[in-house]
């Protein structure tokens, strides 16, 4: 009887430990407000920080460049950011929250380089995963 109880206890401990390893990592950006999500986006694009990109972009994320008509999905844009990991843009970056209502937020980020200016219009949406970047539209005024 004692051996059966020990075996059952060992089985429960093994199941519990295997379950803890199988759990997916929690989203570290889940509790951030829209302002901090915009800052995280800018850190990814202008400073090459790709640590939280998996959680930063919504599943239906799209990136559009008005100047050349390019459009990219989440997978394509994350691959681009990963390829340019660590690359820091030599620009002055400012941003502002244009509007936030309910589950949607619109922000504008301006990156001033020596010879040109890049403006990103960033749309964020809030879901159970918290605020995420759902669309970016880049212009060069």
List each language-model region with its residue ranges:
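Short beta-strand edge/turn micro-motifs at domain boundaries
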Residues: 119-141
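Surface-exposed, charged secondary-structure patches
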Residues: 26-30, 78-116
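Solvent-exposed, acidic/flexible segments
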Residues: 27-35, 46, 50, 70, ...
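Short, low-complexity N-terminal intrinsically disordered segments enriched in polar/charged residues
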Residues: 2-9, 16-47
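Short, well-ordered alpha-helical segments enriched in acidic and aromatic residues
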Residues: 47-60, 64
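Short beta-strand segments enriched in hydrophobic/aromatic residues
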Residues: 57, 111-113, 137
């Amino acid at each position: 009887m004692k051996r059966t109880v020990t075996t059952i206890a060992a089985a429960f401990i093994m199941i519990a430990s295997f379950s803890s390893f199988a759990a997916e990592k929690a989203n570290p950006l889940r509790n951030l407000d829209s302002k901090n999500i915009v800052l995280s986006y800018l850190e990814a694009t202008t400073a090459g920080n790709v640590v939280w990109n998996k959680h930063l972009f919504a599943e239906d994320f799209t990136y559009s460049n008005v100047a050349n008509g390019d459009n990219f999905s989440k997978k394509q844009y994350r691959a681009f950011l990963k390829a340019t990991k660590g690359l820091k843009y030599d620009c002055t970056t400012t941003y502002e929250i244009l509007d936030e209502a309910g589950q949607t937020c619109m922000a504008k980020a301006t990156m001033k380089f020596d010879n040109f200016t890049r403006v990103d219009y960033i749309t964020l949406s809030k879901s159970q995963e918290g605020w995420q970047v759902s669309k970016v539209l880049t212009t060069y005024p």
